[in-house]
Amino acid sequence: MGIDERATSLPPGAMRGAIVGTVALITVFAAASAPIPLYATWQQQLGLSASDVSMTIVMYLFGVLSVLFFAGSLSDASGRRPTVGAALACGVAGCLLFIGLSSGPMLQFARFVQGVSCALSMSATSAFVIDCASERHRTFGMTIASTGYLIGLTVGSLGIG
């Protein structure tokens, strides 16, 4: 399908999908960066060692990399919307784990879940935003797809104060 055909074949609510995808992308990454400034507090409250905190970072990276390596094209097979939904569900689950945080392993698992959420969002939500953007707003879609996660990381880190 050519660019001209794509511009006329988008459903009427496609731009709304691009906006929803943008909000989802920024939200997932804001939620993932919000816990980082709290590591020192949790280290003191939970009695974590420096290596426990380091392992928390490793678990996040393991979550991201495992999804990108083994399920990076998941949204191509199952569709963008279900994969974006899974990314949001993992993001919510990660946040809920932080609410009841009581141990180092729980902190590490919460960060792993957030890593999975971010990886799913990186691939599927970015593609969803681009797919939904009309030709007139294609630059917007591509800009959000490439910078939305950075905006989310900034918002989350600043938001936690």
Model-identified regions with their sequence ranges:
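Small-residue-rich segments within alpha-helical transmembrane domains of MFS-like 12-TM solute carriers
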Residues: 29, 33, 99, 115-123, ...
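Small-residue (Gly/Pro/Ala) motifs that create kinks and tight helix-helix packing interfaces
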Residues: 39, 152-161
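Cytoplasmic helix-loop-helix junction between adjacent transmembrane helices
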Residues: 112-148
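Helix-breaking motifs and short loop linkers at transmembrane-helix boundaries and internal kinks
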Residues: 47, 79, 100-106
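Central cavity-lining transmembrane alpha-helices of secondary-active solute carriers
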Residues: 55-72, 122
